[in-house]
């Protein structure tokens, strides 16, 4: 059963149809990528799934519930987590204060907040950084904190916006391992990133979008060997 589905999504700006009847799906314990050249409509599609941009037509279903008109906050309450491309941590706060800032928005007891805090710190291997100020963290530590914050609401689904952007190769590898671990725990994951190799190396499937439509979908091998994908996006010399 699919956890997230979009059905015939349409988004127009003036006379320009940026997304043109686009349908994608992501199941539980599955990592799916959205790829495509600049202006293809992939980011718009992703933001419609998140709830930042409203669709002009079509449907978005989460766990079989129609969420097309629901806000990003309502989607979060249903079990969707979102990791933005922009830095989302409070640099002047400690690691545990950053996590507690979100925990305090939940309707749970102080004891449960403390338990959840300790559990999250341990799960993402940042317990030793609990009292460190966020501005002192390395790139890898900061990305772990950002992912931890996205997990505070205990989501069943994560939307990751450019998770490999602006970080060193060693940090990319760490982020990939975290994402694969989340998949192993049963989360469905939709990610979009301009780093094609890094994305295809961990996705079960990917959609390549061009001119607001799906050009091809399938495994990394399917995309790499597709003539149209090479012509429009990957190039003839692309190799994993």
Label each residue range with its predicted role.
Residues 35-37:
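The feature captures the beta-strand-to-loop junction immediately N-terminal to the Walker
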Residues 58-65, 78, 116:
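Conserved ABC transporter NBD signature motif
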Residues 154:
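Conserved catalytic motifs of ABC-family nucleotide-binding domains
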Residues 158-162:
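Catalytic Walker B motif of ABC-type/P-loop ATPase nucleotide-binding domains
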Residues 133-137, 141:
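Conserved ABC ATPase signature
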Residues 100, 111-129, 176-180:
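Conserved ABC ATPase "signature" region
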Residues 93-100:
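Short coil-to-helix segment of the ABC ATPase nucleotide-binding domain corresponding to the Q-loop/switch region
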């Amino acid at each position: 059963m699919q956890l997230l589905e979009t059905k015939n999504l349409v988004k127009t700006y003036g006379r320009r149809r940026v997304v043109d009847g686009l349908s994608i799906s992501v199941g539980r314990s599955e990592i799916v990528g959205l790829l495509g050249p600049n202006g293809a409509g992939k980011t718009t599609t992703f933001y419609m799934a998140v709830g930042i941009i409203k669709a002009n037509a079509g449907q978005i279903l989460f766990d079989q519930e129609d969420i097309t008109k629901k806000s990003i906050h309502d989607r979060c309450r249903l079990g969707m987590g979102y990791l933005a491309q922009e830095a989302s941590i409070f640099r002047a706060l400690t690691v545990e204060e950053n996590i507690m800032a979100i925990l305090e928005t939940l309707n749970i007891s102080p004891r449960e907040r403390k338990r959840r805090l300790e559990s999250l710190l341990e799960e993402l291997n940042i317990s030793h950084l609990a009292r460190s100020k966020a501005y002192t963290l390395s790139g890898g530590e900061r990305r772990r904190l950002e992912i931890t914050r996205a997990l505070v609401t205990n989501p069943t689904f994560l939307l990751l916006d450019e998770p490999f952007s602006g970080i060193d190769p060693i940090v990319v590898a760490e982020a990939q391992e975290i994402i694969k671990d989340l998949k192993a725990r049963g989360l469905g994951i939709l990610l979009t990133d301009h780093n094609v190799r890094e994305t295809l190396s961990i996705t079960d499937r990917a959609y390549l979008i061009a001119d607001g439509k799906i050009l091809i979908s399938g495994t990394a091998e399917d995309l790499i060997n597709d003539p149209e994908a090479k012509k429009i996006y990957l190039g003839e010399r692309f190799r994993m």
